[in-house]
């Protein structure tokens, strides 16, 4: 499910195909920035990409993602990976498809590392501290429910945590302010309870001037605690784009390779 992600949706779709994912179902939620046109163009090139449209603007994310997951189950999907346009999934050792094909689990969590633009240097910078939330891929199951934000799935079965994810929530000041405004509006249209998605409410009720100040702090490596997607640890230069393998990401973060001097593996 994507909305106004024209600057990144092609990169994330191509990344998923390089990760060995054979079929992608991407539904556009009323984009006005050319996202749907970009997806339609990609669809002509990538035979495994299936594009749909959702014209309901309200934030019924859990219900919508659960419906899409059930559609995939009904056509024989072996794994379901609910992904956003700003997410780049990896297997910890090998591709995403390889990690899932070897997995003995019913649900596999993905640890999130956020990446941000920085005012002092070109390209993305990745946070070495994992985000406290996770995302989840799962084997299809009749009655499975994808929770809000795709952070979990409600279904029986054993669980693992063998996946990794680079998340690029904010790419420019204009996109930052637009996404916040749209997020708050979608919550209000769905009459979402006040105790859910509180970070969108906090951000969306700031003035444009206050949001501009938050952006300045963000690209300097900080942000208010109420901002969920903010730098939390040491930032490392990742490069102009998200790499194709998790090994490249760990090298950027300065993490020793398994079995190398200074690592704790073995």
Regions picked out by a protein language model, each given a short descriptive name:
Residues 1-14, 30:
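Active-site beta-to-alpha loop of glycosyltransferases that engages the nucleotide-sugar donor
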């Amino acid at each position: 499910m994507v909305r106004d992600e024209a600057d990144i949706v092609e990169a994330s779709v191509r990344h998923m195909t390089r990760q060995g994912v054979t079929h992608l179902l991407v539904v556009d939620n009323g984009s006005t920035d050319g996202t749907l046109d970009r997806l339609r163009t990609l669809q002509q090139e990538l035979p495994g990409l299936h594009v749909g449209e959702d014209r309901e603007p309200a934030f019924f994310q859990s219900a919508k993602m659960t419906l899409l997951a059930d559609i995939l189950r009904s056509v024989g999907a072996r794994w379901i990976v609910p992904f956003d346009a700003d997410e780049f999934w990896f297997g910890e050792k090998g591709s995403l498809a390889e990690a899932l094909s070897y997995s003995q689990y019913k649900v596999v969590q993905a640890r999130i590392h956020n990446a941000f633009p920085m005012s002092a240097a070109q390209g993305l910078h990745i946070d070495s501290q994992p985000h406290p939330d996770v995302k989840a891929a799962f084997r299809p199951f009749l009655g499975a429910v994808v929770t809000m934000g795709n952070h979990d799935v409600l279904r029986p079965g054993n669980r693992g945590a063998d996946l990794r994810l680079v998340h690029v929530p904010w790419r420019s000041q204009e996109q930052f302010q637009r996404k916040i405004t749209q997020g708050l509006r979608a919550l209000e249209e769905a009459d979402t309870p006040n105790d859910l998605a509180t970070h969108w409410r906090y951000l969306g009720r700031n003035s444009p001037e206050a949001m501009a100040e938050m952006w300045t702090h963000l690209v300097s490596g900080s942000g208010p605690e109420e901002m969920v997607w903010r730098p939390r640890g040491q930032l490392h230069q990742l490069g102009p784009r998200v790499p194709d393998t998790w090994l490249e990401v760990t090298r950027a973060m300065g993490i020793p390779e398994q079995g190398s001097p200074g690592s704790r593996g073995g």
